[in-house]
């Protein structure tokens, strides 16, 4: 499996896919890793519909402005979340955390109250659901790249049409589509990214980043070894 820095730098959005299937064991591994994404209060609001049957991909294609890659890719994941769904499992989630040694039972009511107040009054739920679900989608995309598959994230679709075609409730938020498979063509050339000084500020907005912003690829071998050494030292018992 590729190192993470290589996965990030080599990932590209694929325009056209081969019809070759994604083996079940790899698909499940990718989905499992996506489910390990972090989320506020560990509420994991993301939900995924895995679409593989040709007729269902064609239905989805119609709801996504007839993008060719939806009909071509062997797997399309519909990423969505449901408003207020967290109320159905917040107790079980916190109880499981306590069972695993995360926190004390007597703290659960207070944490639950904090979470409920935040989700009901502190932030618009669609915004919160989008934030967390996209973390999981990004994790899924990088996991697929690490296993040697190609992906294409998509935001071009009609949410209402997707909900209607795939039986989602009205209070669902359809957040993204992700195609997974094998690219039919070589990756496009690297389109480049902003230098650090163009998107990173030092301590406050408007204060330039004080690095040279020259990094153009994954950390070199020396840097990778240094990071591994630091991680190893950190894990040593005191």
Role assignments for model-derived ranges:
Residues 2-6, 24-32, 58:
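Short amphipathic alpha-helical segments
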Residues 4-20, 89-90:
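Generic N-terminal amphipathic, Lys/Arg-enriched alpha-helix
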Residues 6-7, 13-14, 176-238:
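C-terminal helix-cap and adjacent tail motif
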Residues 22, 55, 157-158:
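Short beta->alpha linker loops
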Residues 30-36, 77, 99-100, 109-165, ...:
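Small-aliphatic-rich amphipathic alpha-helix that forms the alpha element of a beta-alpha
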Residues 38-41:
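Glycine-rich phosphate/pyrophosphate-binding beta-alpha loops
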Residues 47-133:
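Glycine/small-residue-rich phosphate/adenosyl-binding loop
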Residues 69-83, 168-189:
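A glycine-rich helix N-cap at a beta->alpha junction
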């Amino acid at each position: 499996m590729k190192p993470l820095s290589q996965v990030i730098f080599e990932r590209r959005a694929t325009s056209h896919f081969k019809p070759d299937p994604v083996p079940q064991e790899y698909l499940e591994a990718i989905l499992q890793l996506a489910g390990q994404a972090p989320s506020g209060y560990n509420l994991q609001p993301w939900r995924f519909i895995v679409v593989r049957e040709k007729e269902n991909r064609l239905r989805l294609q119609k709801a996504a402005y007839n993008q060719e890659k939806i009909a071509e890719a062997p797997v399309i994941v519909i990423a969505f979340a449901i408003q207020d769904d967290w109320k159905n499992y917040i107790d079980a989630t916190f109880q499981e955390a306590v069972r695993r040694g995360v926190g004390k039972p007597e703290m659960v009511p207070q944490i639950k109250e904090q979470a409920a107040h935040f989700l009901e009054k502190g932030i618009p739920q669609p915004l919160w659901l989008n934030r967390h679900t996209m973390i999981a989608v990004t994790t899924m995309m990088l996991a697929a790249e690490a296993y040697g598959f190609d992906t294409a994230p998509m935001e071009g679709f009609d949410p209402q049409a997707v909900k209607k075609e795939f039986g989602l409730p009205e209070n669902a938020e359809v957040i993204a589509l992700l195609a997974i498979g094998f690219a039919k063509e070589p990756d496009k050339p690297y389109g480049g990214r902003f230098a650090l000084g163009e998107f990173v500020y030092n301590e406050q907005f408007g204060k330039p980043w004080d690095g040279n912003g020259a990094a153009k690829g994954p950390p070199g071998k020396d840097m990778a070894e240094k990071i591994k050494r630091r991680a190893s030292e950190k894990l040593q018992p005191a």
